[in-house]
């Protein structure tokens, strides 16, 4: 792991003082904020999981090479994406096939990003903007492996949120009140565990009849065991 990050890879700068070397500013990275993945800090690099260390180093090196091409007015290196793609597919194949002894909250997202990258195919990329975005996704996949310790989340927050809404089809980030929603469900299940399945059945019944809003009950009847629905009754 240390050997993968302790020196410069193909001209890719490595900051050693805890500061990123111009990521996304046009110094070190490509113009117009492209190829922010061409730089990294030593502290961040060594904090990545060992399983992604070599791949992350290649992403950084390829990004630096592409950033140099961009600054010189050349197109993306023809072998840049095919090289990264082959290495990623091999690594992601092992990751997807390995059992997960302990569930990690980032695993579903990591698998979604991985499937998206695999589906892109190995054909060379024609534009720097597209290659830069793919390098960012590859780096994001790596950093999901240390999601709670990553020191570079700002590199992904804006770009990856936009990508998720338009490319992965996952939809928007869960609303801020999602925790309150689940807390209410847990409280209901804890208070009346034997009735909880019937509450769920009632909700399914209402949705099947076209109701999209919650059924509002008078406060005096909220503990009743029967809910009247358009002239019918659902007995709990």
Curated annotation (Swiss-Prot):
It is found in: Virion tegument; Host nucleus matrix. This is Virion protein US10 homolog. Keywords: Host nucleus, Late protein, Metal-binding, Virion, Virion tegument, Zinc, Zinc-finger. It comes from Equine herpesvirus 1 (strain Ab4p) (EHV-1). One of its GO terms (cellular component) is host cell nuclear matrix. The keyword Metal-binding applies. Phosphorylated. Residues 1-32 are annotated as: Disordered. Induction: Expressed late in the infection cycle. Residues 21-31 have a biased composition (Gly residues). It comes from the Viruses. A zinc finger (unnamed) spans 138-150. Belongs to the herpesviridae US10 family. GO terms for molecular function: zinc ion binding. Pfam families: Gene66 (PF02053).
């Amino acid at each position: 792991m240390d050997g993968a990050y302790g020196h410069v890879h193909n001209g890719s700068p490595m900051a050693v003082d805890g500061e990123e070397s111009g990521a996304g500013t046009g110094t070190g990275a490509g113009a117009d904020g492209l190829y922010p993945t061409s730089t990294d800090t030593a502290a961040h690099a060594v904090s990545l999981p060992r399983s992604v260390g070599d791949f992350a180093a290649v992403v950084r090196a390829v990004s630096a090479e592409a950033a140099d091409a961009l600054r010189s007015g050349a197109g993306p290196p023809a072998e840049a994406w095919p090289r990264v793609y082959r290495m990623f597919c091999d690594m992601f194949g092992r990751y997807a096939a390995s059992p997960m002894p302990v569930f990690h909250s980032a695993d579903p997202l990591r698998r979604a990003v991985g499937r998206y990258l695999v589906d892109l195919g190995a054909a060379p990329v024609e534009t720097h903007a597209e290659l830069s975005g793919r390098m960012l996704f590859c780096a994001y996949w790596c950093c999901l492996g240390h999601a709670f310790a990553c020191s570079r989340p700002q590199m992904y927050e804006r770009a990856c949120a936009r990508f998720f809404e338009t490319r992965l089809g996952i939809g928007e980030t869960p609303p801020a009140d999602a925790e309150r929603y689940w807390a209410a469900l847990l409280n209901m299940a804890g208070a009346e565990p034997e009735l909880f399945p019937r509450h769920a059945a009632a909700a399914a019944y209402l949705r099947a009849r076209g109701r999209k809003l919650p059924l509002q009950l008078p406060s005096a009847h909220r503990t009743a065991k029967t809910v009247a629905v358009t002239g019918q009754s659902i007995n709990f």
